[in-house]
Amino acid sequence: MNIYLAKIDDEEKIAPLIAQFRVELKQLKGITSKPKIDLAKEEFREYLEAKYPVLVVEKDNELLGYLVCRIDGSVVWAESIFVSESARRSGIASKLYQEAENIARGLGGTTVFNWVHPNNDKIINFLAKRGYNVLNLIEIRKPWENEVFTQKISVGNHKYNY
C-alpha cells in the first residue's frame, strides 16, 4: 500500500471515487443520484489548481481512497475523505488522516478541522476515535428553494432544520 500526493495523471483513477463520494454525500440528505465522472474530474482538477493536497492510497495500481486537504494559513481542513466500499474497515482512512495531521503539525497546528453532516454517523464516529470531539462552528443558512428537511438538530438551546 502506497500513500502519496495525487497528480493530474491520477485523474482517471480518482474520478470514480470522487463521484461516489458525492453520491453518498447526497444520500445523507435523502437525495438519490448517480456518479458523475465528468464532474468528478473537474472537481479533482479544481483541487489541484487550488494547490489543495490530495492524498491518495494505492494498492496494486488501484486507488482505494483519498483525502483532500484545504490549507488556510496554518489551518488544515479535511475537505473530503473517501475510501472505496471494498477497502473500508482496513485502516486506510486512518492512514490518510494521519498524513493530514502530519501536514497540520508541519504548519504548526495541532488538529485538522472538519465540516460534517450531523447525520453522518460514519465520519463522526471515525473522528471521535481519533479524539475529535469538540464542536467548533455550525453552518447556518437560509433554506434553498424547494428544500425538504428530514429532521431537527439541537445545538445547545437552539433547534435547526436539517
Model-derived features with residue positions:
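A short helix-loop-beta-strand connector motif used in the catalytic cores of GNAT acetyltransferases and
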Residues: 42-56, 77
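Conserved beta-strand in the GNAT
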Residues: 56, 62-70, 77-82
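Glycine-rich acetyl-CoA-binding "A-motif" of GNAT/NAT acetyltransferases
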Residues: 62-65, 122, 134
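Conserved beta-strand-loop-alpha-helix junction that forms the acyl-donor binding cleft
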Residues: 114-123, 145
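A short beta-loop-alpha structural element at the N-terminal edge
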Residues: 1-17
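Conserved acetyl-CoA-binding loop-helix of GNAT-fold acetyltransferases
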Residues: 83, 89-102, 125, 129
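Conserved GNAT-fold acetyl-CoA-binding loop/helix
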Residues: 2, 22-43
